[in-house]
Amino acid sequence: DAGLFKENANPTKDEVNIYANSMQRCIATARYFTTAFLPVADIQVNHRYVPSKMDPVFFPRLTKISESFKKEALKQIADMGGKRGIRGINEDLKKAYEITASTLDLKDSPACKEGKLCAFDNYNTEILLERGEEPRMKGSLKDATTCSDALILQYYEEPDAKKAAFGHDLSLEDWTQIARIKDVYGDVLFAAPIVAVNVAHPLLTYMYDELNAKGRKFSFLCGHDSNIASVTAALDVEPYELPNSIEKKTPIGSKVVIEKFEGKD
């Protein structure tokens, strides 16, 4: 509608840049997108490393770290739970934890019978911040997120909602609660301002260069939900919740769109 490209356009390499992290799923997603975006053009999907090797531009790892950085990062993360701190973050997820555990029949699971995991009741989340590594955590939020990820994928892939929930009758609100765990996990690890600016810096630098590249009309960067979480936090994007989605922050297939307009005005 804006006249950026004509129908059946075949843009030059300078006009379009399709750049993916070198993970297999990112390369595939970029190819699928490009086929639909410019179906008659032979557009190269650029990635820099052998498949399944993380590209530093998309790798949300801590590039600089110090004791003062750790202290401030942990404070900012704890502030997400209000006066109750880290424990408060988990307490606010109590209902979501219970729905997820019930859906998985966690108390009757092999993990529980082996004494490994019977409930998501370890609220003392441990945050691990190391130079050159992604922010990590230990505790129930981590365990529940692993389960939430799997269930949400199943929700999208399985047409039968009851089958997706292992025979349980889950409401849309129940699924939203399960998905909320993943959203909170992303915020805790990547959305604290001091952490977001740190881990998103390589990608933000690349984005800045793309927005200022001579002759560039369109750039498509294909990464991960952690990239969206850190970039939006680093740019101080106002809080939002997506409508008509059980995932309110970074659903599968979500995109951040940045437009640059130039003219006499």
Spell out what each predicted region is:
Residues 2-17, 21-219, 223-265:
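Signature for phosphate-centric chemistry
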